[in-house]
Amino acid sequence: MTMNTPRPRSQPPPPHPPLFKPTTPPPPPLLSTSTSTSPPHDFSFAHYLSSPPPSVQRRGRADMSRTPPLGRVGSDLSHNNYSSKANQHRQTGSSSSSKEKDREYKAKSKASSPFFSGLGGSWRSGLSRDEEVKRKAKAKTRGLDVGQWVKKYMASMVEHLLASFSRHGGGEREKREQQRRRPHSFSAHGPSALREQRERWRRRRGQLSSAPASLRASPVNSGHLSVGGSVKVSTSSEESTMEELQSAIEAAIAHCKNSITVAK
């Protein structure tokens, strides 16, 4: 008897290779390794808690790129400290140099102050000397002006007095000339008039004989004698004009002296 032996089944053909390979990686498994031990209905979020989402990762990387590393921060701090110290040193150096300059300037000013003070004193003394010379010159010119004015005043006064004296003197001379030229007439009649006339002549001759020789020989008395008149050496008008002239001259001299003392 023959037994029906089963024929071996033919194996299926191998699958064809894919035409293109996917470039994106496969998504991570939703469940971790602990799912094998956990029941199927119990889900675990440990994977999500352990690895943050991609947006959070990108934000953290950007923040880290923005914040400098610790070494860079330390170098920046050291650089800032060095620059502040350099600025302080520069400021102290500039302040010390300014103080030294001030000291040098004060020393120079102290050294040059006696020289300038001497110059100022000499300049002031020169100015005072010039002012004194100007004042003396002004006083001198003022005195000269006063002297000139006094001289002019005196000259005008003398001219006025001489003119008045000449007028009065001319009138007196004219009167004397008229009396000298006038003929002597005897208005009396009879022997009594003749006797009186003779008595007068005798008295007149007696006065002349008793006078000194200088008076008799003077040119004033050598002229014609008027009848019944008296001998006059100087008239009252001449004496008054001479006194006025003398008083005016004395007043002018006193005024000149006073003006000269005031000018000095």
Curated annotation (Swiss-Prot):
GO terms for biological process: brassinosteroid mediated signaling pathway; lipid metabolic process. It comes from the Eukaryota. GO terms for molecular function: kinase inhibitor activity. Residues 77-97 have a biased composition (Polar residues). Keywords: Brassinosteroid signaling pathway, Lipid metabolism, Phosphoprotein. InterPro entries: BKI1/MAKR1/3/4 (IPR039620). Residues 9-30 have a biased composition (Pro residues). Residues 1-146, 165-240 are annotated as: Disordered. The keyword Ribosomal protein does not apply. Interacts with BRI1. This is Probable BRI1 kinase inhibitor 1. It comes from Oryza sativa subsp. japonica (Rice). The lineage of its organism: Eukaryota, Viridiplantae, Streptophyta, Embryophyta, Tracheophyta. The gene is BKI1.
